[in-house]
């Protein structure tokens, strides 16, 4: 009985917050598609001089508004292939999948401009590591924080133009054979532009 009471309370709270979001005249869901430039910090703690390339990637995110001001955003992309270089020469590649979950605060009442800030967590899965013909490898995952600032500019009732900047903290230990050489901190800044649809 106690569990049923808790479940009912949670459902009631979700319904109430969704109703608050809808009371603003906008639906609680926002889906965006962005082109994002990934700019690696490349803070190499191994002393080897490793660098990971920058690139532009596709990104999709889904936001749910609990109130007109408070939302949660899930940021997704497809696995990305990166090149690792040493002394300017490529030594191999790896793939990473870096979804992030952020809690956002959206500012309202600014004559059509809708800035927001966010903070949350990133989980990066690292796969398909091929460095020095198998002589080196990386940790297979990373947990870290994520920070965000952005702005939506409404184009009509549903569509909006979006500008977004995120700082994501990603690191991986580097191994030569079984010896840990230290951490490579990628810590990229992601600068994105795209379109959003609110419903």
Regions found by a protein language model. Name each.
Residues 42-49, 82-90, 127-136, 173-180:
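Outer-membrane beta-barrel translocator domains and adjoining extracellular loop/strand segments
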Residues 4, 25-29, 68-70, 111-115, ...:
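Outer-envelope beta-barrel architecture signal
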Residues 52-54, 142-144, 152-154, 158-162, ...:
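Subset of outer-membrane beta-barrel
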Residues 37, 61-131, 188-199:
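Gram-negative (and chloroplast) outer-membrane scaffold detector with strong preference
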Residues 99-103, 118-123, 140-151, 165-167:
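Hydrophobic alpha-helical segments of small multi-pass membrane proteins
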Residues 21-63, 72, 127-128, 194-196:
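Short glycine/proline- and aromatic-enriched beta-strand/turn motifs that initiate or cap beta-hairpins
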Residues 1-27:
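Cleavable N-terminal export/targeting peptides
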